[in-house]
Amino acid sequence: MTASAVLDLVKDLIARPSVTPDDVDCQMLLAQRLERIGFQCETIARGGVTNLWARRGAGAPLTVFAGHTDVVPPGPRDKWDSDPFVPTERDGFLYGRGAADMKSSIAAFVVAAEEFVAAHPEHPGSIALLITSDEEGPAVDGTVIVCDELRQRGEQLDYCIVGEPTSTEALGDVCKNGRRGSLSGRLLVKGVQGHVAYPHLARNPVHQLAPALTELVAIEWDQGNEYFPPTTFQVSNLHAGTGATNVVPGEAVALFNFRFSTASTPGQLKARVHEVLDRHGLEYQLDWELGGEPFLTPRGSLTDALVSAIQAETGLQAELSTTGGTSDGRFIARICPQVIEFGPCNATIHKVNERIELSSLAPLKNIYRRTLENLLLAD
């Protein structure tokens, strides 16, 4: 198949305005293609979210491609040089919402699977795709529930490639063999409201909170390790008061987030925060939300297969990285021992005029196909 096969499918997907969590039949289009080459396709839907599980073969190893058909809203349409849902070729790029994140990856893998099956119809092992329309949104009815379903069935995943746009300067320069965890907190410090002229009759929660936050910001939570940078603590929001300058507020709220490595656990981070707050004598309420545990795939079969495929196709030696935000890889890592993320350049994702280089579509497809060959056809 030529590069046009990938391009045609990408265009079909971009033309469907699948703003999260609406799939707009993107997955139906994929299922029709996959069923023609022997995949068994199943829709798992909940809460307005559409998920596709498509599998070909029953044996091991099971290699999975994971992705999402949903996209973020395009923002002001008048800021785009062309309609975000009318795929447009211009100056060597394909423009449209989802072009880089991540409809090109999905199209490239589907065509790669078609080529692989055509060349190896009796291939060993199994190939599957896990596609959701709830990655850009709350991510509560998407990949996570499919993983729960697969666990309950006893389906054993061996390898998973998540098609996130990981490349930075050139296709193949970076892939992600892990991600940091995310732990958020909402801290409410209680005071006593009063008149600023009579501070002895009030208790200012801002004054109480400030030294505690200063201490938390200064803490070295860990030193990271060979795979992850040190854990970070960032205050993202502060709120107190009525807007008046003559009223001592009755409460103060701080929102904060940890991005943490495998060098720390959520329990350790929580305990240390509580120790600081208690030592400062605060009257407080602290609510926690664990966005995801960190995961890591050390060098092994999957990383070697992908890095080798990238080098064969592009000549680049891919860097293994764990930087960036969270992804659905955090859910898949619970049921799959080896997870890696790889896709096109990410410079324009979530931006106006999102785009992908047309010349990268065929190499992306070839890298996915070569990775399948390395994993399933190796002696």
Curated annotation (Swiss-Prot):
Described function: Catalyzes the hydrolysis of N-succinyl-L,L-diaminopimelic acid (SDAP), forming succinate and LL-2,6-diaminopimelate (DAP), an intermediate involved in the bacterial biosynthesis of lysine and meso-diaminopimelic acid, an essential component of bacterial cell walls.
Cofactor note: Binds 2 Zn(2+) or Co(2+) ions per subunit.
Reactions the enzyme catalyzes: N-succinyl-(2S,6S)-2,6-diaminopimelate + H2O = (2S,6S)-2,6-diaminopimelate + succinate
GO molecular function: acetylornithine deacetylase activity; cobalt ion binding; succinyl-diaminopimelate desuccinylase activity; zinc ion binding
Assembly and interaction partners: Homodimer.
Species this chain originates from: Bordetella bronchiseptica (strain ATCC BAA-588 / NCTC 13252 / RB50)
Designated gene of the protein: dapE
Keywords in alphabetical order: Amino-acid biosynthesis, Cobalt, Diaminopimelate biosynthesis, Hydrolase, Lysine biosynthesis, Metal-binding, Zinc
Binding site for Zn(2+) 1: H68, D101, E164
Name of this chain's protein: Succinyl-diaminopimelate desuccinylase
